[in-house]
C-alpha cells in the first residue's frame, strides 16, 4: 500500500478498512512493522489507556483509517472513501477486509449493490473466508456459498481463483490480479482457517475471543515459534 507512516493522515494514502474489527491485533502488528509506532507498544494491547484497544479506533491509533467493531459497516465506509477519491480526483486505492460475520449483515449487501451501481475506481474487497464465526460454523449460522457466484451476481469483478490466504505467494498473486483490473468494484476471496498455526484452536469457534491459561499459552507460543522459524528459513 502507498502510505507514509511518518504522515498517517497523508491525503493521497491508500485506505484500508478492517471491517472485522475484532482482528485488531493483526492490524496493529502490521502498523508497528510499517513504522507507525514502536513494536514495543504492542505489549499494551487491550490495556486501559492504551492506544491499541480491542477494536481499532481512528482517533487514537496512527494508521487506522476507520474505527470498526460492529460488523457490517466496513463496505459502506470503504465505498464512501472510494467515491470521495473520484469526487476529489485522487488516485488512491481503497481496500476493505471482510469476514464471515460481515457477510451475514444486510448493510454489507446494500453497500455491495450501491458499489456496483456507482462503480468507484480502485475499490477492492478482500474476503477472509474461513467459514467459522462467533457462534459456530457458518454453514449452521448463515451459509454463504456459493460466494464467488453471489458477488458476481451483484455485478462485482471477482477474481477467477479462490486464493490460499495462508500462502504469501498466493496473496501476492492475488494482488497481481487486482492491480491488472479495470472493472470496478473488485473482490478477492481467500480460503483460510480460523486459528491457523495453533493446533487446538484451528477451525474451532470456541476460541473466538477466548482467554488462554498458562498451559495453552505455552503450547500456542511453541507452535507459533516453529512456524515463524520456517518462514524465516524461506526468507
Task: Show the residue positions of the predicted features.
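Thiamine diphosphate
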Residues: 63, 67-180
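Generic secondary-structure signature for well-ordered alpha-helical cores
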Residues: 32, 36, 47-50, 83-86, ...
Amino acid at each position: 500500500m502507498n502510505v507514509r507512516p511518518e504522515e498517517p493522515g497523508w491525503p493521497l494514502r491508500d485506505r484500508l478498512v478492517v471491517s472485522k474489527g475484532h482482528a485488531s491485533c493483526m492490524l496493529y502488528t502490521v502498523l508497528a512493522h510499517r513504522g507507525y509506532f514502536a513494536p514495543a507498544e504492542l505489549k499494551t494491547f487491550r490495556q486501559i489507556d492504551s492506544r491499541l484497544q480491542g477494536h481499532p479506533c481512528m482517533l487514537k491509533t496512527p494508521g487506522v483509517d476507520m474505527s470498526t467493531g460492529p460488523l457490517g459497516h466496513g463496505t459502506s465506509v470503504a465505498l464512501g472513501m472510494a467515491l470521495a477519491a473520484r469526487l476529489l480526483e485522487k488516485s488512491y486505492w481503497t481496500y476493505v477486509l471482510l469476514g464471515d460475520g460481515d457477510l451475514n449483515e444486510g448493510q454489507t449487501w446494500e453497500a455491495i449493490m450501491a458499489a456496483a451501481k456507482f462503480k468507484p475506481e480502485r475499490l477492492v474487497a478482500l474476503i477472509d473466508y474461513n467459514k467459522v464465526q462467533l457462534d459456530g460454523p457458518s454453514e449452521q449460522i448463515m451459509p454463504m456459498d456459493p460466494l464467488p457466484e453471489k458477488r458476481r451476481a451483484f455485478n462485482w469483478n471477482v477474481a477467477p481463483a479462490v486464493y490460499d490466504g495462508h500462502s504469501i505467494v498466493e496473496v501476492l498473486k492475488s494482488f497481481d490480479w487486482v492491480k491488472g483490473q479495470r472493472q470496478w468494484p473488485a473482490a478477492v476471496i481467500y480460503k483460510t482457517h480460523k486459528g491457523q498455526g495453533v493446533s487446538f484452536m484451528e477451525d474451532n469457534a470456541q476460541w473466538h475471543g477466548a482467554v488462554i491459561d498458562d498451559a495453552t499459552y505455552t503450547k500456542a507460543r511453541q507452535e507459533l515459534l516453529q512456524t515463524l522459524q520456517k518462514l524465516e528459513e524461506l526468507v
